[in-house]
UniProtKB/Swiss-Prot annotation:
Expressed by the venom gland. GO terms for molecular function: toxin activity. Keywords: Amidation, Secreted, Toxin. Belongs to the cationic peptide 04 (cupiennin) family. 02 subfamily. This is Cupiennin-2e. The modification Glutamic acid 1-amide is found at E35. GO terms for cellular component: extracellular region. It comes from the Eukaryota.
Length: 35
């Protein structure tokens, strides 16, 4: 069950990253949040 949750979160994160990547400076903000 835990594995399926991780997979779901990974898919959501991937979609969010793609959307943010289209906006200037969004990837920089994303890196700041990960740190």
């Amino acid at each position: 069950a835990f594995g399926t949750i991780l997979k779901a979160l990974a898919k959501i994160a991937a979609k969010a990253v793609k959307k943010l990547a289209t906006k200037p400076g969004a990837t920089y903000m994303l890196k700041q949040n990960l740190e």
